[in-house]
Amino acid sequence: MINLSKRLQTIADFVTPGSRICDVGCDHAYLDIRLLQQETIPSALAMDVAPGPLSIAQQNLMLTGLLGRCETRLSDGLAGYKKGEAGTLVIAGMGGRLMASILSADPDKTESFRELILSPQSEPWLVRGCLSLSGIGITDEKCVEEDGKYYCVMKAVPGAPCIRPDWGAVLQRIDEMSDEELSQAGVERGSIRRILSSEPFRAGVEAEYGPCLIKNADPCLKKQLLGALKSRISVYNKLCEQTDPGVAAKTRMQVLRGEIGRMQALTFALCYAI
């Protein structure tokens, strides 16, 4: 049986058993092969825009004796897909901008799937924004660390509400904390309440980091956030050491202050209030 990377295995775990998948950007069809070998799915449609990867996918399917259960198709995004051919759409291994363009190119096709399993390599906020505009709710999400990088894997369902953090409960938890507890956490009650009560803050962090990941206080997200926060503070401190910073440096410092403040507030919420 073929072995999957941690990220691909997380994607596989999100697929509803018995659902035929349409794997866009299938690369070598490893995901399709594993799901078929496990009998998780009855059949699959593997599509890729490049002939090379599709040819390798066909070879892998032949070697595993699964070519009859997985159709391969040359397609730019969902251009070669017909509505109703699959219940689950899987897109992974590409940037968020390209993924969002595929999802928005033909809304009828995108919304015809019962579920979407998506794992952008970058700019996940663009994918989350695209889903929100299309009325496709994120119902589950995992953060995966692989080879020193962090990836999100999200499950979304057309017409379903997006699972979001209970910010009201977060504020209630802050109200229940003593001044000593808040001091040990490095925050001031009024200040942290104002930040976490802000709708722009909530919308921003949910888009950037994932509403489900925040709601579940995902341990991998915490690790990712702490690493990113440390990196930004380091850059900010180096800029502060400049004796005569120019306009570009001052602008960068202002941006970093905002980013660091938001990240610190979210880190507090994840570690103490969610």
Q: Where do the model's predicted regions map?
A:
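Conserved S-adenosyl-L-methionine
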Residues: 24-25
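Conserved SAM-binding loop of SAM-dependent methyltransferases across substrates and taxa
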Residues: 28-41
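Short SAM/SAH-binding signature in class I
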Residues: 85-93
